[in-house]
Amino acid sequence: IASCLVGSEMCIRDSMKKIGLVALFALLLAGCDDGGEKKAQENLRKAEAALEKENFNEAKLQIDSIRILYPKAFEARKQGVKLMQQVDLKEQQKSLIYLDSMMVVRQAQLDSVKGNFVLEKDTAYQEVGNYFYPTQTVEKNIGRSFLRGQVNEQGEMSLTSIYCAGGTLHHTAVKVSVGDTFAETPASKDSYETTDLGRAIEKADYKMGEDGGVIAFIVANKDKNIQLQFIGDRTYKTAMQPNDRKAIAELTELARILSGMEQIRKDKKEANLKIEFVTRKMQEQEEEK
């Protein structure tokens, strides 16, 4: 029995030693663990180098890595927040420079073609005017059934089908065709009818993108004979005149230029708002010091 007790005491002492060594090792590890600060600082250096080269995506990636890989590296994460603000600020500043240069290009494109169109705008009640092709203005087309194009100053294009060939169709759609190929609008969301000296006049509007591909079809076939069909309670067919095909094709290009300019304005506004926000946050942090 005595030998068993002695053996048990030795086992207990050995176990205590092992526990003590494990505890000591854990304490040493705790003393050496910096929460990943050193490794996180390396990511910060890489982010700063990327920022110097204006590689904004790489800089953001390195900063985000600190938050994901080293969540306890509090000092590095704090520095990362400040560095991210610098990245955002410089990225938006560079974006503004690019957008300004693109606006110069677009403005030159507009200046080279806008003389080919007529701008109709009554400043008394219109904030946004509309461009028409000269051959399609109202005064030159009284009593004619045709498809008219227009583009507003923000680059939004639409078609208007005008029917006044006698009687009523109550038309709400049009179809254009060349041989067996065709495009057809869906039913117009904006159609209206009136009379002028007893003659019925019907109009229906179709916005680009909601036109069933009619605009694109006309542009693709502008040098071909296109048949135009008004669709209502009955149908009416006529041939598109060459000037009408040309008008819609050229208005499409004008719409591309104007819509591009409008998008640049929106992007500049967004960039300036971001710069304002980041600058304000940076100032608030400086004041808190």
Regions found by a protein language model. Give the residues of each.
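Single conserved hydrophobic/aromatic residue that forms the stacking wall/gate
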Residues: 1-14
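Alpha-helical linker/edge segments of TPR/alpha-solenoid repeat scaffolds
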Residues: 84-114, 125
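C-terminal motif of bacterial Sec signal peptides marking the signal peptidase cleavage site
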Residues: 28-31
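Internal interaction segment
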Residues: 199-205, 223-289
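Bacterial lipoprotein signal-peptidase II cleavage site
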Residues: 33-39
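Short, charge-rich amphipathic alpha-helical segments embedded
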Residues: 36, 60-92
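Hydrophobic/aromatic side-chain positions at a characteristic register within alpha-helices
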Residues: 44-52
